[in-house]
Structures are given as C-alpha cells and as structure tokens.
C-alpha cells in the first residue's frame, strides 16, 4: 500500500485537493483509496469523503498536541489501510502551530497552502513547508498573476527542492500533475523503522500536563522565556526580542 501525508494550515483547501486527487488517481488505475483525517476539535469533512465514496476515519486530538497525536496513531492508520486492502492511504492533518510537521522520511510529503493567506505566509509556516517533497498552492485563480509569482517565489525561498504545483480545488486543474507525481510512491506495510523528518514540540512543561494557573511558580519543566527591556526607552520601535520575540 502507498502512503501519502498531506498537511497544511486550516482552511487552505486540503480536503478539496485530496478529493480531486483521488478522482484522477482512480482514473489512472489506483482504485482502492482510503483516507485518515487528523484534526484538533471538530470536522465535517468526513461527509465530503463519504460522498466521494472514500472510506474515512477521523480522529480528534482534543487536549493532546496534534502532532503527538498524529505520530501516536499513524502506524495504526497504516495497519488499518493494509487490512482494508487499500492501494493507497492518504492522511490529512492541519499544521496548527507552524512549528510542527507530520512528514515521515521515505514517505511522500505534501504541504498545501493558499494564495489568500498572504504573500509572506510561506516564511511563517516552518518545517511543514520546509521539509515537504511537494508544495500545492491553492486559490491561485482569485489573485493576480503577480501575486501568484511572488507567493511562489517565497515558497521557493523556504524550500529550494520541493515540486510546486498549483491546484484548483473546485475545477481540479492541476490535480493530474499532482497525481502523476504521487502515483509511483513506494509500497509499505509498516512504519516501525521509519522516522519523522523533524522533531515534534517538547511537550514537557507543566501546561502540557494540564496546568492552567498563570505565574512563574506554576511554570515547571522546559520553558522558553523572552527578555523585555527595562523601560520603553531601551527598545527600538518594531524591534523583536532576541530571545524569542518575533517581529510581525
């Protein structure tokens, strides 16, 4: 069975791209395709998969870090796909914190981002984009050609090696190129000997384990603190703190 991981920011068009991709893959001979959606709190996309005739399992991380939830369940998802006799299993997950990446070594990794998110968005997404094999850009039909080119350039600045494909989630334009790129993925039956391409967040502080109170006396474990100037005269306008602050 072939495994494809597809991730991207919320509402970037991942599900629409996947459904159009599946339509093309079926036409090319890959008939038995299943999907697993990893989400945080709620999702209604299972209805769209069911309408398309795609077996779907949806899991919600709830209070657990979404990427820890993903890596704790992905091998079980693969086993389900193998037992179900799928030719291909596609996983969909949202990169909620831009620090995370569900990409697995040796497994085709796709990152979906949309043109409407802003031309500087590619520089903010992090390892989910940087370590992807293929970057799919959506909603390019409702921005200018200049905006598309600038957005694509910024994607290339972050990831110099990925294949970049524009896909229209409504018409399906571009889905053929994506299917052609992914259909020759290697077959796998288990992920036990494989690794993530990037580390997940530490998840070892008191707030990770359920603490809700605010104050240094409640902050235990691995904490990252910012340094702030002693007065407003010491800070340059718009400057970012060197120990964790980030200029927006």
Locations of regions flagged by a protein language model:
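P-loop NTP-binding site
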Residues: 2-16, 23-27, 189-248
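Short, glycine/polar-rich helix-capping loops at beta-to-alpha or helix-loop-helix junctions
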Residues: 42-46, 120-125, 147-154
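Canonical P-loop GTPase G-domain recognition
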Residues: 141-197
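Short, surface-exposed amphipathic charged segments that create phosphate/polyanion-binding patches used
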Residues: 71-76, 176-186, 206-211
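Conserved beta-strand segments of the P-loop GTPase G domain that flank and frequently precede/overlap
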Residues: 37, 59, 92, 110-115, ...
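Inter-motif core of Ras-like GTPase G domains
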Residues: 95-116, 124-133
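Nucleotide-state-sensitive switch-loop elements of NTP-binding domains
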Residues: 2-12, 16-104, 140, 173
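Short, well-ordered alpha-helix to beta-strand connector turns
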Residues: 53, 86, 106-107, 132, ...
